Amino acid sequence: VSYNPGTSVKMNPVFASFWIQKITNIPSIFTLSTNDLNIQAIEGLLLGAQSLGLNNVVFVMGDLPSRAISTTKVLEFTKKMNQGLDINNDKVSYATSFCIGSTIDISKDWDHEIVLTKRKIDSGSDFFIAQAQFDIARVVRFLESYRNVTGTHIDIPILWGVQMLAKGSGSFTNIPDNIKFDLENGKPGFDIALDIIDQYFSYGITSFYLLPSFFKTGRRDYLSAGKLISTLT
């Protein structure tokens, strides 16, 4: 569950995740932005989330990184909370048991992103979420570059984004011209998403998440996303 995506105010992701998990009985992941909250607020939200039965959290830097607590610092003190301690090494009400996630953005400078990715792993990230990609060969090149620079594989799960498309829908990443052409000439966005997933499979990558197609009105096509999940499972 994203943290206030777009410009409008949304339900706090902790409460939205609790509602989704309660209704579906499927473990939910909530997101917290480190530029809107101080350390005490984050710790309080994490304790509250844990009391509601939420165990999965992703930390993002947000749109104002100059105001944000570094993601690595948040990862470190959340790991301490899993040991029953707060940032000052004082005991918290109860030890948490979070599976802690952070993000990878391969659209940025790779030299910096590779170093940051390694730091996030060392700081306690249990998994990564990556932005939607249309060029899967680029994903593979990034993973190879990481291995060449650090001497190790990324040995924690990465959930790669698959952006579903439709005529008139938006995208959080640039859409290649060939995919725009296919879409404008009648190829269903459903089939385009399947093609992208097949490319992931061809490289042995089997972990991803779907972003339903979205429109300027705010509408999101969750039905098509559900159909795609049913097709894959």
Where are these regions (language model features)?
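Catalytic beta/alpha-barrel core
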Residues: 1-9, 32-34, 57-61, 126-136, ...
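Active-site-adjacent beta->alpha loops and helix N-cap segments on the catalytic face
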Residues: 7-20, 37-45, 63-90, 110-112, ...
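Active-site mouth loops of central-metabolism enzymes
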Residues: 27-40, 98-112, 177-192
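Catalytic-face loop-and-helix region of soluble metabolic enzyme cores
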Residues: 153-209
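C-terminal extensions of enzymes
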Residues: 194-232
